[in-house]
Amino acid sequence: MPSEKLLRKYARLAVRAGVHVQKGQMLIISAPVSNPEFVRMCQEEAYQAGAGEVVLDWFDDRAERNDLQYAPLKTLQNVAQWKKDKRRYEQARHCCFLHIDSTIPGVLKGLDPEKLDAVMAARRKAMQPFRDYTMASRGQWSIVAVPNAAWAGKVFPKLEEKQAVEKLWNAIFKTVYLTRDNDPVQEWKQHDRMIAKHCRRLNQYRFQELHFVSELGTDLTVGLPEGHIWGGGDETAKLTKAVFNPNMPTEETFTSPSRSRVNGIVYASKPLNSQGRLIENFWLRFENGRVVDYHAKKEQAALKAILEADANSARLGEVALISYDSPISLMNLLFYDTLFDENASCHLALGASYPDCMKDGASMSDKELMAHDCNVSSVHVDFMFGTRRMKITGVTAAGREVPVFDNGNFVF
């Protein structure tokens, strides 16, 4: 385990720069049972920051696997009314959410895929009305991560358990700019300013489309809707006006693509961990915004489930640009966790777009977002496709071609 000093600095970072709890505000912490010490530190930091109430929602992925394996499908598909009432109560109080991630790669491997997909679909449908609170950044939310032995063993398979866990802790600290001697909260303010520079430049160009080409075979044109906005780094919550960082780490500059003007083929550059199933070596072919063909060397059924989750899950909801020479990429680690791996590579997301990435999008209905060529879906699944040789060209309304990436990196 890291020193108490480092853990407390990490907890402070999560509370004050991540979710940025406000005076008197309710904070909901969803946390793994495997790391209670760090969770209690976050709770304490939140109260010291002025939180009015801190609610701990514990989860256990292995216990969840038992439920999914043994409980009847009808039981699992029934999302209890009290769970929806709880979320409605929390959001009515303008709460904020901190999720402490601790993935267990492959934890759902071997389960009946049809049963699993049916359960996830029922849960998404039941909780969809409450996802907009975070997707549209009405309140603050943030995700940070802590290791567990299974995850560390997957990332560092040649090390003994204790060494692997320690090394994963160190890797996580590096991704969030936390050292023994620095002030990580101030470090993140500087980091956010750097990301904002890329956002400003991309927003100035008002590109109509981006063309992606890579050595893996990607040749994809992604249209951008009129009124799209590039974002990244910190955000401002609509209800509380608090500035927060949704993902820690983050290196991306992102926007909502056109739901109808995506054409070509894209090859994933990293595996995708979806609900504990690792989808590997896959590609997608798009026509007029929709996936019309696909293949995965491993877990194709899991990829199929994503694409068929609802009527719009086979369309794109996000395009994100990250230099190949970003700090996380240069670590040359596969984390088997999208929170990290998406920040080592340009990525796309199947499913829902972010309303904030469209002018006045946060106040639009689903129907209005669709009318503005933004996608609406019950899922949002990121996958990585950036490479060392990736080239990206932006095309303006006047037809001018502007280099955006060369050899995997921003040119401006």
Q: Predicted regions span which residues?
A:
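A short secondary-structure junction signal
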Residues: K109-L111, G153-P157, G233-E235, R277-E280, ...
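Short linear motifs in exposed loops
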Residues: G223, Y294-H295, F405
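Dual-mode signal for accessory low-complexity, basic/Gly-rich regions
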Residues: D293-A362
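Active-site lining segments that contact anionic ligands and/or coordinate catalytic metals
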Residues: R261-N263, I279-N281, N288-V291, A314-E318, ...
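Long, well-ordered mid-to-C-terminal structural blocks that present hydrophobic/aromatic surfaces
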Residues: T253-A309
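Active-site bordering "gate/hinge" segments
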Residues: M1-N263, G394, R400, F410-F412
